[in-house]
Amino acid sequence: MHEFLKAFRDAFPHTISIFLGYLLMGMTFGMLLVQHGYDYKVALFMSLFIYAGAVQFVAITLLSAQASLMNVVIVSLLVNARQTCYALSMLDRFKNTQWRLPYLAHALTDETFALLNLYAPKEGVSEKDFIFSISLLNHFYWIFGSLVGSLVGSHFSFDTQGMEFVMTAIFIVLFMEQYKRTTNHKNAWLGIFIAVVCLALFGTEYFLLIALVLMVLALMLFRKQLEC
């Protein structure tokens, strides 16, 4: 327990920016859910067991349109397909996490993946507890935001337009932090180039998964050149 608390204290400051973003986005999700006729219990269930922001927002629309369960599953898999790339890149760090592994796989969101690649535990701090703490904290923030939003939304109405930009802003900040911490920026510029080209060719609806696949292939094929 002492080791876990030590790792938890080390991890917490790194998650504050995610707390702010997840609080706002979680509240937006909770409010939208209530506006479509669902209550806080649905918000709690979805945030506990689905825990995928984009999928949860899409699910509101699908459920309201009385879509079949099969359609919901297919759309969810397509929307979250990018997580496969994240999981593959985290295999080495997750392999010794023991009983934590199933939860870490469940809790590997975009933001958690970014933090785990940006920060490492201090000397003397257990890495597996550090990884677990970041994952657990971020999940708690999302659940908390969803619950607050659903409870507040059941009593008040809000205009949530534009709130989705919060997470985009956080990603830009995380990218800049990682950019400043490294001296070799070839990977960063390669990622930007591939993303921009895919966005221009395939549009906002399809570019993300294609860009991620191309980035993984590029890193595999040109690893030595990029590390120089």
Go through each PLM region and give its residues.
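Residues that define the loop-to-transmembrane-helix transition and helix capping
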Residues: 41, 70, 100, 128-129, ...
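Helix-loop-helix junctions within the multi-pass membrane cores of secondary transporters/permeases
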Residues: 2-3, 74-164
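Helix-loop-helix hairpins and the membrane-proximal interhelical loops
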Residues: 1-50, 61-70, 227-228
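Residue-level signature of the transmembrane alpha-helical core
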Residues: 16, 23, 44, 48-49, ...
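Membrane-embedded alpha-helical modules
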Residues: 128-210, 221
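Transmembrane helix boundary and interhelical junction motifs in multipass membrane proteins
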Residues: 24, 28, 41, 52-59, ...
